[in-house]
């Protein structure tokens, strides 16, 4: 984009601009004609599963292989009797429902019916303790994602409701949950798209005050979205990437937010350039050339952050990034070609009714942002202290942080499957909602052995086990399956923590029963959620480190500085903690959610860091440009004044588009939308205009260390004066101060690096077969760096005659990493997020 020849080729005239616009429209149309519908290739099942190599998935595969017919998806009908004789009412209703589902007119996909009528021996498992409620199990064949399967579930529900009479009846279970999930999502994309378009259009009209200019970003986003969706559908159909309904929803708001941001940046610079260059084609070329570096850095950061998700082993994260990275890459190409070309093609009418002159004058950036810049220049210490204090207060919401793995509680709309699970919880106990499947595989045949019964007896005495169903023998005679009902909510953290001890208890029971070298696996929803939690913990740690590394490298390359990326990344981390704290307080403490969705935290971090750094990139890039003509203090003031309006408008639009996700009836999307809106507003109106300029103002010439601002290029050249007699002494004092400041900077970098190593070591010590060596090494180095840092802070403060406030801020910054490390350790132990070492005496043999 820095090539003038390329810009002249694309934007040299109206005819060339028309060719560019026609090219994109043609590409969008051609791809739409050959690509399948995105909905037809969406995969919503794998996103909620643990890694394929996890124990729970191995257990599921064994159930399908060893128990023929058990791979059907069950619908569970809950019947609760009414009246004085609830037991009789429930029995009559179950008989009528069983008859309707067992006849020749039963719905398609229904394999069989298991109830007290067809299986009276199973009454102990199908009838509640007070006999007022009963269960009817209806295995259904086919894929829950097929429309015919969902229609069959609806028919089962209609028949059950019709034949139940006065009894309370609900259809739940995996089949009911899958059908309700599809219904909750159905139509959501259209509502989301419409709400986003209307909201963005209103904001753009308020910003541009021109209807045609407001339509330009929307048309660009529409073209980019069409191209990205069709390319994504083609790649998903070929099995190259995975696309889910949630990913598609986030793609919509992401492209609207990012696309309008890029459009605002480019068109604002275009209006500003028109003040000096009346030729619109040359002005647009100059605008694109001057914004290319920052916009490309922004897009590259987002794309690389999305690709960083590929290191994840959990399907929910692994398949999330490529599709979004594709969309942002397409949006960046459209922003640099389609948007400038369309603006040129529309000519002077694009600024109607205000005209070019008023549009150009609005780009001067006077008004409130000049006053804010002046405030930061007058009192940088007070401004920085106030912002940091507010962010710390918001971070306190993390005290109520907890995660939720319950899919049904994540629906913000009432569903029949959730009502059914509520009935099961009340009448049969919480564990009956989702039994765990314990699998014991032996090298010997167990058909005639008493071991399976002995193991079942032993399991009834295990912690948190309510009951154990009769063992089922696999067709190979070597594999035994036990349905184990826990006395805990199967979606709670305590239930997830109980899976490990249950496996150990089964291993001990198998050895006591004489089954040597047995392979023990735990399946079911609770075990799957435990494996998902372990995978997410591992993935989140890797993704955090990788995304921070990516952002740091991009900032180093863009700003040619080693120090600036450190304090910019620190502001992003502080913003993330404040955002997550505010989200936890609002959704969990105030709204009463079970917890933060198990994947939401990782999503928030990746998106907030990748998008939040954009505004830092925009203002710091302008700061670098202003340094060519002004000293640092005036340069940061000018950068904030010139970019304040456009970046704030961009942030407002981006926050608004993500806030639209709060209209979706899914907890994860609601929480993610709230968090992103909150975090982007913090970045836009606190961190970017106040905290970052205050830090730059405090650092002065060292803000871009080791780069030093050159002599500003001013029209007048000051006359030289003869050196004074004190010049050698002044130079010596300056050299000593520079060395001290250089040492101060390097020890800050060392402290940050040793802190990162300490966090990694703390995580690794929780993994089996690892030691605490990393914690000891990096802990010692970090402690030494901390002491040296505080000492140098005092020396620098004395040497430069700092005030107490500035000295206190820098000293407190050194205390933040140790405090966060301790908080991390306490939080990890409280929540149990980090994997705990297993206590198995020997490794589990492979099947």
UniProtKB/Swiss-Prot annotation:
Matches recorded under PROSITE patterns: SSD
Pfam families: DUF3817, MMPL
Keyword Nucleotidyltransferase: no
Chain ranges passing through the membrane: 18-38, 187-207, 215-235, 248-268, 302-322, 326-346, 381-401, 539-559, 562-582, 600-620, 643-663, 672-692, 744-764, 778-798, 808-828
Subcellular location: Cell membrane
Cross-referenced InterPro entries: DUF3817_TM, MMPL_dom, Mycobact_MmpL, SSD
Transmembrane helix among keywords: yes
Bilayer disposition of the protein: Multi-pass membrane protein
A GO term from the CC aspect: plasma membrane
Region named Disordered: 708-729
Keywords on record: Cell membrane, Membrane, Transmembrane, Transmembrane helix
NCBIfam families, sorted: integ_memb_HG (TIGR03954)
Matching PANTHER family: MEMBRANE PROTEIN MJ1562-RELATED (PTHR33406), MEMBRANE PROTEIN YDGH-RELATED (PTHR33406:SF6)
Family, similarity comment: Belongs to the resistance-nodulation-cell division (RND) (TC 2.A.6) family. MmpL subfamily.
Record-given protein name: Putative membrane protein SCO5905
